């Protein structure tokens, strides 16, 4: 398995933020010499060169020199790119939001090896959270190879495709909501007299430590809330206010609306 991974050559179509993030992760696993990228914005060539990654002038050349092709373009550009991959015989990974396997098969054909992945921005630091499904045309060896490749970028959840829009809202957009919460904590710290920089560090360390504690204890969050909350104490006063303002309901509706938007893409 590891020998197969080390000899893979991965092509990435679309060298935006996510394409760059995956290029960095994959290069750590495979070596930069086994990564090739392309983008319709030719200025991205300079960026690829700075990163030490080969830049292909077009999709066909990239596909001809890749065992796996990752499609990392905007949904509006999906048809144009997929048309250029109709003759490709390797594995196609798509991280395009809202572009189902069925839509891809209509362009590529039902015989193609298609894997749909929904990542989040945390891939950039190797801590991404990704959903994965495929159209059933991959062998077990190919499926394992793809999963091992992606695990170099974070954690992987194999789910039904019908849940992808919900996953997009929860994990794909989730980091932005977490960043907003951290910013709110930091601003609250400023209101209490800290500098923003110090308050941000305190908020960030608090969130990271809390997440680590919850993950290691593997309990319901409410159990840890109870450990922090003393009867008649300071924490319960804050919890009470959050509940009065509908904090949990607001977060739930935030995810619901984001999921509904994903369905419309």
From Swiss-Prot:
Its EC number is 1.5.1.2. Its main location: cytoplasm. The keyword Lipid biosynthesis does not apply. GO terms for biological process: L-proline biosynthetic process. InterPro entries: 6-PGluconate_DH-like_C_sf, NAD(P)-bd_dom_sf, P5C_Rdtase_cat_N, P5CR-like_CS, P5CR_dimer, Pyrroline-COOH_reductase. GO terms for cellular component: cytoplasm. It comes from the Bacteria. Transmembrane segments: none annotated. Pathway: Amino-acid biosynthesis; L-proline biosynthesis; L-proline from L-glutamate 5-semialdehyde: step 1/1. It is found in: Cytoplasm. The keyword Kinase does not apply. It is an enzyme of class 1 (oxidoreductase). GO terms for molecular function: pyrroline-5-carboxylate reductase activity. It catalyses: L-proline + NADP(+) = (S)-1-pyrroline-5-carboxylate + NADPH + 2 H(+); L-proline + NAD(+) = (S)-1-pyrroline-5-carboxylate + NADH + 2 H(+). Keywords: Amino-acid biosynthesis, Cytoplasm, NADP, Oxidoreductase, Proline biosynthesis. Catalyzes the reduction of 1-pyrroline-5-carboxylate (PCA) to L-proline. Belongs to the pyrroline-5-carboxylate reductase family. This is Pyrroline-5-carboxylate reductase.
């Amino acid at each position: 398995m590891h020998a197969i991974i080390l000899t893979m050559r991965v092509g990435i179509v679309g060298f935006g933020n996510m394409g760059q993030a995956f290029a960095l992760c994959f290069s750590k696993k495979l070596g930069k010499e086994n990564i090739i990228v392309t983008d319709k914005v030719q200025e991205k060539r300079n960026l690829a060169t700075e990163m030490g990654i080969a830049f292909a002038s077009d999709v066909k050349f990239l596909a001809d020199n890749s065992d796996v092709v990752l499609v990392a373009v905007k949904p509006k550009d999906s048809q144009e790119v997929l048309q250029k991959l109709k003759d490709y015989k390797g594995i196609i990974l798509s991280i395009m939001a809202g572009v189902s396997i069925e839509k891809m098969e209509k362009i590529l054909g039902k015989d193609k090896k298609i894997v749909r992945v929904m990542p989040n921005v945390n891939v950039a630091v190797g801590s991404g959270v990704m959903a994965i499904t495929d159209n059933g045309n991959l062998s077990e060896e190919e499926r394992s190879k793809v999963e091992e490749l992606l695990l170099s970028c974070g954690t992987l959840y194999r789910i039904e495709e019908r849940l992808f829009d919900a996953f997009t809202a929860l994990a794909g957009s989730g980091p932005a909501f977490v960043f907003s919460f951290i910013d709110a904590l930091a601003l609250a710290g400023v209101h209490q007299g800290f500098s923003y920089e110090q308050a941000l560090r305190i908020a960030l360390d608090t969130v990271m430590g809390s997440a680590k504690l919850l993950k290691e204890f593997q309990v319901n969050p409410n159990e840890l809330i109870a450990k922090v909350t003393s009867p008649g104490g300071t924490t319960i006063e804050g919890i009470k206010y959050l509940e009065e303002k509908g904090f949990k309901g607001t977060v739930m509706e935030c995810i619901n609306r984001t999921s509904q938007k994903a369905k419309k893409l």
